[in-house]
């Protein structure tokens, strides 16, 4: 997993509430267990027609937002069924951070385990970010996990909270396996004594 320390990226404003995991990555694309290759199916039913043609009006199909790495969302992002494929699709597309007023718990936890930083900000703060992102194509935010702050180049600055353990894992690029491997010598010593 790649460390997340400071990230600057274009913000894609997805102005929909209750975006569920089936919208993030539809069920027909869940037939694989490897983590890569899902980005092409992200928001598939919103991005493409039934014939596979791009829907030009969808935010990620517009030129200003195709290279976005910060997703701005509304309340209850990631609700619905538990599927780790949802953060896999976001990450594979290129997103490193999702900002919203609230997240579904399982999705929120899965983001951390897969190298995506989910940030909870107030509805007022998210509204202000939507105003800026929608009025300024290529609007960028810098997310500083070390300092726990979201900034733009116009002076906006919003602090955010992250659990210290999750922060440590993201800063160091550690998933569950990476944490376990830190104790590989102790595990080997234990196994040798058995």
UniProtKB/Swiss-Prot annotation:
User: Which Enzyme Commission number(s) are on file for it?
Assistant: 4.2.1.33
Question: Keywords on this record?
Answer: Amino-acid biosynthesis, Branched-chain amino acid biosynthesis, Leucine biosynthesis, Lyase
- Report the enzyme's class at the first EC level: lyase
Mind naming one GO cellular-component term on file for this protein?
Answer: 3-isopropylmalate dehydratase complex
One GO molecular function term of this record is: 3-isopropylmalate dehydratase activity
> Reaction(s) catalyzed by this protein?
(2R,3S)-3-isopropylmalate = (2S)-2-isopropylmalate
Q: Name one Pfam family in it.
A: Aconitase_C
Question: Is the keyword Lyase assigned to this protein?
Answer: yes
- Give the GO terms filed under biological process for this record: L-leucine biosynthetic process
Q: Does Amino-acid biosynthesis show up as a keyword for this record?
A: yes
Q: In which pathway does it act?
A: Amino-acid biosynthesis; L-leucine biosynthesis; L-leucine from 3-methyl-2-oxobutanoate: step 2/4
Q: Which family does it belong to?
A: Belongs to the LeuD family. LeuD type 1 subfamily.
Q: How does it assemble?
A: Heterodimer of LeuC and LeuD.
Q: What does this protein do?
A: Catalyzes the isomerization between 2-isopropylmalate and 3-isopropylmalate, via the formation of 2-isopropylmaleate.
Name used for this protein in its record: 3-isopropylmalate dehydratase small subunit
Its taxonomic path starts at: Bacteria, Bacillati, Bacillota, Bacilli, Bacillales
Gene giving rise to this polypeptide: leuD
């Amino acid at each position: 997993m790649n460390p997340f320390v400071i990230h600057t990226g274009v913000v894609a404003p997805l102005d929909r509430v209750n975006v569920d995991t089936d919208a993030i990555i539809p069920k027909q694309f869940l037939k694989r267990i490897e983590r890569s290759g899902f980005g092409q199916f992200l928001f598939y039913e919103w991005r493409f027609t039934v014939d596979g043609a791009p829907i030009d009006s969808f935010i990620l199909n517009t030129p200003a937002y195709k290279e976005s790495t910060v997703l701005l969302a509304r309340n209850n992002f990631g609700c619905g069924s538990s599927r780790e494929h949802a953060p896999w699709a976001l990450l594979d597309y290129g997103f490193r951070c999702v900002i919203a007023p609230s997240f579904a718990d399982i999705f929120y936890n899965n983001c951390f385990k897969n190298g995506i930083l989910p940030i909870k900000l107030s509805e007022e703060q998210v509204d202000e970010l939507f105003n800026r992102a929608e009025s300024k194509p290529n609007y960028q935010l810098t997310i500083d996990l070390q300092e726990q702050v979201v900034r733009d180049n116009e002076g906006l600055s919003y602090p955010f909270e992250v659990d210290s353990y999750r922060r440590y894992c993201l800063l160091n690029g550690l998933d569950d396996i990476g944490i376990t491997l830190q104790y590989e010598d102790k595990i080997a010593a234990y196994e040798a004594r058995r």
